[in-house]
Structure formats: C-alpha cells, structure tokens
Amino acid sequence: MTRSQLAGNWKTIFLALCFLILQGLSVAAAAPRTILFLGDSITAGYGLDMEQAFPALIQKKIAAKSWNFRVVNAGQSGDTSAGGLNRLEWLLKNRVDILVLELGGNDGLRGLPPETTRKNLQAIIDRVKAKYPEVKVLVAGMKVPPNMGGDYGRKFEAIFADLAKKNKAALIPFVLEGVGGSRELNLADGIHPTAKGHEIIATNVWKVLEPILRSLAGTQAIGGNGSRSLNAPAVRAA
C-alpha cells in the first residue's frame, strides 16, 4: 500500500467517525425532555379516559407550540404523600426534567397531620433533586373542605406555598381553582372533576408551566429551529 493510499484510508475513517459522532449528537438532541406528573386521582383523571385528564391536555398544548417535551402521567387514585414517596424510586429510573407535584389532597381528606404531609412532599422533592439536580419543580396547591376545621385548613394550605418558597419551586396556588365545589364541573361524588373540569385544571397548570417550558424550549437545538414537535400522546406510568 502506497503512502497516498494509506493517507486516503485514514481520511475515510476519520470522516466516517465524524459522521457517526454527529449522528449520535443529533439523536441525543432530539430526545424529548420529560415532565413527570406525580399525583393522585386528580392527575390520574379518575372516572375519565386518560386523554381527558389534564396531563394529556397539557401534552396537546405542548404539541401546539411544537415544543419537544413528553408528559408522563404518574397519577394514582387514592394516593397520599406517603404513597407517592414509596413509589418514587421506580419512577426515577427514567430521567425527569420537570416535576409537577400534585399530592397531599388525600392526606387532607383523611385528616393526616399537616407536618407529616409536609415532610413526605419535601422528601419527594429532595429525592428527585438528588437524582436529577437540574430538575424544575412545580408544586400544586390544594385545599381541604371547610368541615375539616379552620385551623387545620390553614395549616394544610400553607404547606404548598412554604414548600415552593423553600425549594425555589414554581407554585400553582390552587390546582382546582374554578373547579372545586362546582356541581357542574365534578362527577356525582362531588370530588373528582369532569372532562370540562380537567380543561380548567389544565389552564391553571399551564399558566405556571408554560413560562418554564418556554425558557427550556429555547435551549433545545433540534433541526436548527430550536425545538421539535412531539406528536406522541401523554403516557401513563405503569
């Protein structure tokens, strides 16, 4: 083999390696960021099809913006803050870029000590941040019925604003704003929102979530236009 042939072979190998590296970077860049909705029956969309639950409606809003984010619905009916903490390890096996934490409502309905709920929710945030330090956190505020007592209600409602402040997280003041207590917007049980109710919840969440997604979408250099549409529907965590 002549010197010129050897040089030509090395040039070919070099170009091939460059192509593979660039292809790998392109695939990595195209991977959507994940929004984990960790919640109870409100997040799960109790009594409705999954596509009617507010996380799926958020995915549609994202697709309309052509932003590259994937919604994972980890809502579980009847779940408490302790239950969410117990199943968190499995959920963190997949990367989490944004956490929407909607837990605590069932704690309040059961009259559990607010301090216990606070500790559990803080532990969830701590574990997610320990695994994914760059995660963005949104805390969804919740209220309890008046029959739980005024003192209990004040202590319970303070949990969410306090957690958001302590963790420099975004706060959805009351995720059921405009829905809670409405006969027309809840199922016969008076607790779980109808499809129309979930549309309002999605609007409540979107007001807080959209600015965060917008800021992150600007860093997604995909296909040269900064973002890529994700047409896949929201997925349910098993």
Where are these regions (language model features)?
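N-terminal secretory signal peptides that target proteins for export/translocation
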Residues: 1-10
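Serine-esterase "nucleophile elbow" of acetyl-processing enzymes
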Residues: 28-77, 85-96
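Short histidine/acidic/glycine/proline-rich micro-motifs that form metal-
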Residues: 42-45, 49, 75-79, 106-108, ...
